[in-house]
Amino acid sequence: MEKALAYLGEESVITRDFHTIEQADKVILPGVGSFGVAMDNLKRYELDKVIHEVCERKVPFLGICLGLQLMFEGSEESEGVEGLGLLEGKIVRIPDTYGLKIPHIGWNSLHLQNNGRLFQNVPMDAYVYFVHSYYLQAKHEEIVKATTEYGVTIHASVEQDNI
């Protein structure tokens, strides 16, 4: 992320410091790994609290991969572990009943819908790279801005207010 932002001419700070995040004018929560472990780490450093605070103040917030999953209410990957609950819906495992390989690794076309801000300059059905075993199911279809197909319709991107 840091190199991509630098390439775009944006300054960034990698931190888990509450006050640094609290003062940021934009926040990105990337992530790779386990939903439960990630939530434990957010709570350990009180980052769950500062994430709620910046989102309530309408600071632009981008969750990428696991960072996006954590914004939801929970995940089948870590039953009983609550997510941040900033978006309604859940994270579910891609079913292996279709004979598809799990994890899903590879290029898929992105189907844009509902006029998302993030993909304004991306053509319909552009190919993007996926590496995942779980995907999000947003409770409200109107926040879904991009989907892809991998045995099931996968909500690949959502937007709600500043998130």
Q: What is each residue range found by the language model?
A:
Residues 1-6:
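Short, charged N-terminal beta->alpha structural module
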Residues 139-140, 148-163:
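A glycine-centered loop/beta-turn motif at secondary-structure junctions
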Residues 24:
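An anion/phosphate-binding loop that grips the pyrophosphate of nucleotide cofactors and donors
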Residues 33-105:
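Cysteine-nucleophile active-site neighborhood
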Residues 28-30:
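Structural motif
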Residues 74-149:
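Pocket-forming structural segment of enzyme catalytic cores
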Residues 20-21:
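Structural alpha-helical scaffold elements that stabilize or flank donor/cofactor-binding regions
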